[in-house]
Amino acid sequence: MNEQNGVLRPINGRAVLGLDVDGVIADYAGGLRPYAASDFGVIADGLPEPDIYSIVDAWPFSDYAHYRRVHRAAVEAGLYRSLPLIPGAAEAIRELSTAGVHVRIVTHRLFIGGQHARVVSDTVAWLEKHRIPYMSL
């Protein structure tokens, strides 16, 4: 890689964008909200938009293990196939790709064991549904 005009570029001249999914192009909190609300016994609109990074602290999970249980159930129910798209995200990524940027999806979605095949296939389905170009996941 070399630097040209402040942009790191691989030898072949294409810029590489490491693109996270949740909270960047997909609304993870919006997608998890109905699952968490059901678990808490509240209406989904009763859960505020998280104003801190840790959703475990933003919503009334008893602890991290509680969050993991809700998250696991949501993933098994298809969370990653149905997350809301952040407005304008798909268009922006398509524009970057058209300009020659190599889009590489980087994500921490694989943090719970036993769900890897589901997480990867649902992530790919979501990216394709929204026509978000990428070269690797």
Would you name each region that the model predicts?
Residues Y80-P84, A89-T123:
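Substrate-recognition element of Asp-dependent hydrolases with the DxDx(T/V) motif
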Residues T123-L137:
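Structural recognition of alpha->loop->beta junctions
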Residues N12-R14, G100, Y134:
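A general structural motif
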